[in-house]
């Protein structure tokens, strides 16, 4: 019989990989990545980021003497094809809890001539908890600290290599791909920024954060390892940062239990909200031409870099939903495809939270003032000057809507719905 196949999906790494180590304990392995067209229907920047990290994973296999197959096509066709060609004894992978991942894995299992073994992914809390939580705090209280992460294999058995990895022009500079770069970034953050994370995490320029989200989104960096290393250092910064990592798992938990949140608000009252299909307003928001400095700077940075701080994301999202009344789903999708870290579950949770649509305890009547938010979280205006230099301050300049009138309009509509 042949080797065991280790099928990498949202886990483009060798460290802290239960499926890889389980397979290695049972025999020689060959890695596999399937370039799934269902996941590659996105922007060039996101395709390029994914492909460069697949390339880095292949190099990691090679450096340890192993081989990674890369096949292009539908997983329920290509995984069985690889298993047959290699005469594989079984396929190992980490469990996916997304709606598409569960559908995909069911079809692959049906088509495979050998067993498919799915092992738990190293979440901080498993998304498939039997009780469904809609509020973050009781969910987070279940967390008791990170379990020790698993080490990467020192060596991998030799095997045949198959498949080419295409090139894609991202249209913008990308971070250094691969888990070595991710681990180096984690070390740098823990040493230099974690001690002040609690005080600086809300900076609009994102310099108080880790900037590791593009690696987490593809599983290039294990969240369990990240939490473990942060908790070893301790302090308020570590506590706050691990809480943010738990928000990621809360996002997966929500999408697992409420898969329909991808299409409609968690709060059923807001399914009847009168969103405004205004193409001119949508384009003004999307292109960063609203006349509202914080929003314009945020959208321009996102277009230019594929990254945005959490504080800027919340403000850009809430302005679209609450001030402009734009359809939240269209905006969420457009926003996600600009992000290098465009994780569907995380972005859906973020937009429904910012929009007051039922995620967590975020009240619908909370409406950020983008002027005060800018002054508070970029007090010297350096971030604003970099991305929207035509604005001397955070005061609006010929805005597409009057901020106070738009706030009152939204609250009137939302309260009418909330009261039934």
From Swiss-Prot:
Family annotation (InterPro entries): Crypto/Photolyase_FAD-like_sf, Crypto/Photolyase_N_sf, Cryptochr/Photolyase_FAD-bd, Cryptochrome/DNA_photolyase_1, DNA_photolyase_1_CS_C, DNA_photolyase_N, Rossmann-like_a/b/a_fold
EC number: 4.1.99.3
GO MF entry, a single one: DNA binding
SUPFAM superfamilies in UniProt: Cryptochrome/photolyase FAD-binding domain (SSF48173), Cryptochrome/photolyase, N-terminal domain (SSF52425)
Annotated spans, Disordered: 147-176
Cofactor: FAD
Residues covered by region (Interaction with DNA): 244-251, 310-311
Effect of residue 201 to A: Reduces CPD repair activity by 20%
UniProt-recorded name of the protein: Deoxyribodipyrimidine photo-lyase
Source organism phylogeny: Bacteria, Thermotogati, Deinococcota, Deinococci, Thermales
Protein's gene: phr
């Amino acid at each position: 019989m042949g080797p065991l196949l280790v099928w990498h999906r949202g886990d483009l790494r060798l460290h802290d990989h239960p499926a890889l180590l389980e397979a290695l304990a049972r025999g020689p392995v060959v890695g596999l990545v399937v370039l799934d067209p269902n996941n590659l229907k996105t922007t060039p920047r996101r395709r390029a980021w994914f492909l460069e990290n697949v390339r880095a994973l292949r190099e990691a296999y090679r450096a340890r003497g192993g081989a990674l197959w890369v096949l292009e096509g539908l997983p329920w066709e290509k995984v069985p094809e690889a298993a047959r060609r290699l005469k594989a004894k079984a396929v190992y992978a980490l469990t996916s809890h997304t709606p598409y991942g569960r559908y995909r894995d069911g079809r692959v299992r049906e088509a495979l001539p050998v067993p498919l073994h799915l092992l738990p992914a190293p979440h901080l809390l498993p998304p498939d908890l039997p009780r469904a939580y809609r509020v973050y705090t009781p969910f987070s209280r279940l967390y008791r600290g990170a379990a020790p992460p698993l080490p990467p294999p020192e060596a991998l058995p030799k095997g045949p290599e198959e498949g080419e990895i295409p090139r894609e022009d991202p249209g913008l500079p990308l971070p250094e791909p691969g888990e070595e770069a991710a681990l180096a970034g984690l070390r740098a953050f823990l040493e230099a920024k974690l001690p002040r994370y609690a005080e600086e995490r809300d900076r609009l320029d994102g310099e108080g954060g880790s900037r590791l989200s593009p690696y987490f989104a593809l599983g290039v960096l294990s969240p369990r390892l990240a939490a473990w290393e942060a908790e070893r250092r301790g302090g308020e910064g570590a506590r706050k940062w691990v809480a943010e990592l738990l928000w990621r798992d809360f996002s997966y938990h929500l999408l697992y239990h409420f898969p329909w949140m991808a299409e409609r608000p968690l709060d059923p009252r807001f399914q009847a909200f009168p969103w405004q299909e205004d193409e001119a307003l949508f384009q003004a928001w999307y292109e960063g031409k609203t006349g509202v400095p914080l929003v314009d700077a945020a959208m321009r940075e996102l277009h230019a870099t594929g990254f945005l701080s959490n504080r800027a994301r919340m403000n850009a999202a809430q302005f679209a939903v609450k001030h402009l009344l734009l359809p939240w789903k269209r905006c969420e999708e457009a926003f996600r495809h600009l992000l290098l870290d465009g994780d569907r579950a995380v972005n859906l949770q973020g937009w429904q939270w910012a929009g007051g649509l039922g995620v967590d305890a975020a009240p619908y009547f909370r409406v950020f003032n983008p002027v005060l938010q800018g002054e508070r979280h970029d007090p010297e205006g350096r971030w604003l000057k970099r991305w929207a230099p035509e604005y001397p301050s955070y005061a609006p300049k010929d805005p597409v809507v009057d901020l106070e009138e738009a706030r009152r309009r939204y609250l009137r509509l939302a309260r009418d719905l909330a009261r039934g």
